[in-house]
Amino acid sequence: MANTTESAKDRVVIFDTTLRDGEQCPGATMTLDEKLAVAELLDAMGVDIIEAGFPIASNGDFEAVSEIARRTKRATIAGLARAIPADIARAGEAVRHAKAGRIHTFVSTSAIHLAHQMRKTQDEVIEIILKTVTQARDLVEDVEWSAMDATRTDIDYLCRCVEAAIRSGATTINLPDTVGYATPQEYGAMFRQVRERVPNSDKAIFSVHCHNDLGLAVANSLAGLEGGARQIECTVNGIGERAGNAALEEIVMAIRTRADVMPYDTGIDTTMLTRASKLVSHAANFPVQYNKAIVGRNAFAHESGIHQDGMLKHSETYEIMTPASVGLSKTSLVMGKHSGRAAFKSKLAELGISLSDNQFQDVFERFKDLADRKKHVYDEDIEALVDEKLATAHDRIKLLSLSVIAGTRGPQRATMKIEMDGRTFTEEADGNGPVDAVFNAIHEIVPHDAVLELYQVHAVTEGTDAQAEVSVRLKAGERSVTARGADPDTLVASAKAYLSALNKLSAASVRLHAQHAAVV
């Protein structure tokens, strides 16, 4: 990559697929409100294209894509579709209210996929490309075509497919490393060959889409840029199937930090990266690893004495970017029980959080309640309150009260009161430990067949009065959901997380009914 001046920078299109590919990882199901919150933040931070879902997959996905298309102000909204007429028609319908809509259609091209998944000949797949891309272009002006498993596709055949897609009206050509197999050298070379050999390649933008199975997703994406691609498909925090996707925040900050060798501009407001990371982490219920590049808790932490000495003398001795450049503030101890509405609203604005009047009122009341129980309320506490409000806005099952008897002798006992579908239920149950008793009490009120697959606890902030954040993953049949709950009381946080998971199962059409004998 050659050095260049600022004025010569190429524009790289950022295509975010957090709400589609990111949500495909097990347990990452988001509610409609959570998807809307993520989409609105992505739109505000400057993401060019938001792939909002797979409209044919379910009514919920169709509704999410349609609603996001109506709500977003500047981003192009894309709907995914297989190379099937019904899929393409459904995607077109879902994005028709967008300021700018895109249909993203795909078909397998590798020999192994054609033989064992598609069971089609190469010529038959070419015909499918011609027909389905033409259909999509009749519905929208902006059509993206993807060659599924491109990196394991014969290069001669890949060029034939790309030429056919562009000839049929595709405006973007995506060559994904679907199984995370390629190396950066191979991936960049593939783009150079295709662009050189396909006669109409100048009529489309080329796109990268990399999976992280070998830990090369970001490196491969950047190599694709060097090969001539000008769109990068990525997800916040790198969430996605298997080992995940290329991480948006890593892509953007790599380009910004190494502008000397990567002369590109992404148009992203990088000061919103940390907030986006936290929002997606909570909505998808996937914690960010502490040593995650850019947005991990330790990304700007220095413990080594030599490093600390250098940082105190000059920050650039060990930091290649500033915390402020990704939205991290050095101040956090400013809110308490005496803070009023104006101060709280100002703090939300500082954190990049926008709420409706009703949402603000509810979160402010929760903040005052928390401030009465905690000496200091940190930014992370406020973010947890907001995220919990967004996640539970339309819950069928809500926790009203919980008391637990625990000690070194005898069984632990939990007494719980919940509201479900507007009715109040009370039950008590024993357990082998207080958490077991809490979960047993929930099961007494809401019988279900879901299996607990994960239970984790960590502190949101420091100190003995810190809020506990509990993660719970439940599996019912083939459906797996993950949910979180936060509270200074670990047992209350556990109950909130478990009930939130049940609410997600309910939203996914898993049948849940309260025991009528417990009605009070």
From Swiss-Prot:
Its cofactor is Mn(2+). Mn(2+) binds at D21, H209, H211, N245. Pathway: Amino-acid biosynthesis; L-leucine biosynthesis; L-leucine from 3-methyl-2-oxobutanoate: step 1/4. PROSITE patterns: AIPM_HOMOCIT_SYNTH_1 (PS00815), AIPM_HOMOCIT_SYNTH_2 (PS00816), PYR_CT (PS50991). Residues 12-274 form the Pyruvate carboxyltransferase domain. GO terms for biological process: L-leucine biosynthetic process. Gene3D superfamilies: 1.10.238.260, 3.30.160.270, Aldolase class I (3.20.20.70). InterPro entries: 2-IPM_HCS-like, 2-isopropylmalate_synth_dimer, AIPM/Hcit_synth_CS, Aldolase_TIM, LeuA/HCS_post-cat, LeuA_allosteric_dom_sf, LeuA_bact_synth, PYR_CT. GO terms for cellular component: cytosol. It is an enzyme of class 2 (transferase). Its EC number is 2.3.3.13. GO terms for molecular function: 2-isopropylmalate synthase activity; acetyl-CoA C-acetyltransferase activity; manganese ion binding. Disulfide bonds: none annotated. It is found in: Cytoplasm. Residues 398-520 are annotated as: Regulatory domain. It comes from the Bacteria. It catalyses: 3-methyl-2-oxobutanoate + acetyl-CoA + H2O = (2S)-2-isopropylmalate + CoA + H(+). Keywords: Amino-acid biosynthesis, Branched-chain amino acid biosynthesis, Cytoplasm, Leucine biosynthesis, Manganese, Metal-binding, Transferase. NCBIfam families: leuA_bact (TIGR00973), PRK00915.1-3 (NF002086), PRK00915.1-4 (NF002087). Homodimer. Catalyzes the condensation of the acetyl group of acetyl-CoA with 3-methyl-2-oxobutanoate (2-ketoisovalerate) to form 3-carboxy-3-hydroxy-4-methylpentanoate (2-isopropylmalate). Belongs to the alpha-IPM synthase/homocitrate synthase family. LeuA type 1 subfamily. PANTHER family: 2-ISOPROPYLMALATE SYNTHASE 1, CHLOROPLASTIC-RELATED (PTHR10277:SF9), HOMOCITRATE SYNTHASE-RELATED (PTHR10277). This is 2-isopropylmalate synthase. It comes from Methylorubrum populi (strain ATCC BAA-705 / NCIMB 13946 / BJ001). The lineage of its organism: Bacteria, Pseudomonadati, Pseudomonadota, Alphaproteobacteria, Hyphomicrobiales.
